[in-house]
């Protein structure tokens, strides 16, 4: 009986430890986004639907808002499916060309790689993909299976 209790206690401690190490929006990703992206993508910027109403020229000079979990996820799952991944990608997925926002993930290669890995881990195993909602060119649209891999704990 004592061995069973000890084994259960050890198992619970291991599970709690694994959960504590998983990145969350509140503890990890949100503060990094605020620090690295907030100056251009903060609370004063338009949300996705308002940003999309701007003309093409204006959208080139006004950044969309990504200061919260819901506004961030707009560019992961829908309606801006995959946009976050395409912008932050280090180029190892996109044929050697980093996304246009990758450079802002940190001041050094090491910091950028660390922050990118944190976002990838937070999204979930296999959730990092560059697909849009609809197919474009040779790139197919995102699948239900790909979207189901997004975990992104709050």
Regions found by a protein language model. Give the residues of each.
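Aromatic- and Gly/Pro-enriched helix-to-coil junctions and flexible linker segments
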Residues: 21-154
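Bacterial N-terminal signal peptides that target proteins for export
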Residues: 1-8
């Amino acid at each position: 009986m004592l061995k069973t209790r000890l084994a259960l206690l050890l198992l619970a401690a291991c599970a709690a430890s694994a959960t504590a190490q998983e990145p969350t929006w509140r503890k990890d990703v949100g503060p990094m986004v605020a620090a690295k992206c907030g100056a251009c993508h903060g609370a004063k910027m338009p949300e996705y639907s308002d940003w999309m109403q701007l003309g093409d020229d204006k959208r080139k000079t006004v950044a969309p808002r990504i200061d919260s979990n819901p506004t961030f996820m707009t560019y992961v799952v829908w309606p801006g499916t995959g946009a976050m991944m395409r912008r932050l990608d280090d180029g190892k997925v996109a044929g050697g060309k980093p996304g246009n926002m990758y450079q802002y993930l940190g001041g050094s290669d090491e910091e950028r790689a660390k922050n990118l890995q944190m976002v990838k881990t937070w999204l979930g195993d296999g959730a990092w993909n560059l697909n849009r909602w609809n197919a474009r060119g040779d790139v197919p649209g995102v699948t239900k299976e790909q979207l189901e891999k997004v975990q992104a704990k709050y």
